[in-house]
Regions:
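RNase III-family endoribonuclease catalytic core
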Residues: 2-113, 122
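Short acidic capping loops at alpha-helix termini that bridge into adjacent secondary structure
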Residues: 125-128
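C-terminal edge-of-domain segments
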Residues: 142-160
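Short, intrinsically disordered C-terminal tails of secreted or membrane-associated proteins
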Residues: 182-186
Length: 187
C-alpha cells in the first residue's frame, strides 16, 4: 500500500457584510471571507492538501477563478469533486489535520458541526478529521482582523482504482471504516 502526505495553505481577506463560510458551515460574524467562490478557506486548504498528496496540482488548476462557472460556488461541491478525482486515481483519505488562524469570531464552538459536514461530504468517519483554531496573538494581517488563514495536512493511501470505486459506490460509511482498518492491517 502506498501512503502519501499533502499540505495545504490558504488565506482570504475579510470584508464587512459578506457571509462567513468555514468548514462547510456559515459562521455568524459581521465580516466574511472575500473570494471567487464562497471563500471557505478551510475547505480550500483541504482540497489543496488532497490534490497535492496525489500529485494532482492544486485547487486553482482544477477550479480556476477565471472560470465563471465557479463564481460564488459552494466549496463543498469543489471538495466533493476533489474526492471523486482522488478516488478515480485509486486513493482514499486516511486522515486530515487542519488549523484555522483567526482572531474573531471564536470558531471552537463551531468545530463539531464543521467536522460533521466535512465527513459527510468526503464520505469518511468524523474521527478522520481534526480541526483546530488559533490566533496570531494580534500579529500580522490575521491579528489585525484583515484576513483568515488555514493550514491542512492530509494522509492518503492507495487502495487501487477498482477498490476505491467499489468502496464508495456500494458500502455504507460504517462498513467502509471497518473495512479500511482491516485493509491497513493486511496491506
Amino acid at each position: 500500500m502506498k501512503i502519501r502526505v499533502g499540505f495545504g495553505y490558504d488565506v482570504h481577506q475579510l470584508q464587512e457584510g459578506l457571509p462567513f463560510w468555514l468548514g462547510g458551515i456559515e459562521v455568524p460574524h459581521t465580516h466574511g471571507a472575500l473570494g471567487h467562490s464562497d471563500a471557505d478557506v478551510l475547505i480550500h486548504v483541504i482540497c489543496d492538501a488532497l490534490l497535492g498528496a496525489a500529485n494532482l496540482r492544486d485547487i486553482g488548476f482544477h477550479f480556476p477563478d477565471t472560470d465563471p462557472q465557479y463564481k460564488g460556488i459552494d466549496s463543498k461541491k469543489l471538495l466533493a469533486e476533489v474526492l471523486r478525482i482522488l478516488r478515480a486515481k485509486g486513493y482514499e483519505v486516511g486522515n486530515i489535520d487542519s488549523t484555522i488562524c483567526l482572531e474573531r469570531p471564536k470558531v471552537n464552538p463551531h468545530i463539531p458541526a464543521m467536522r460533521t459536514v466535512l465527513a459527510e461530504v468526503m464520505g469518511v468517519d468524523e474521527d478522520a478529521i481534526s480541526i483546530k483554531a488559533t490566533t496570531t496573538e494580534k500579529l500580522g494581517f490575521v491579528g489585525r482582523q484583515e484576513g483568515v488563514a488555514a493550514y491542512a495536512t492530509v494522509l492518503i493511501t492507495s487502495v487501487g482504482k477498482a477498490l476505491a470505486c467499489l468502496f464508495h459506490s456500494f458500502l455504507p460509511l460504517s462498513l467502509r471504516c471497518q473495512l479500511k482498518l482491516t485493509l491497513h492491517f493486511l496491506l
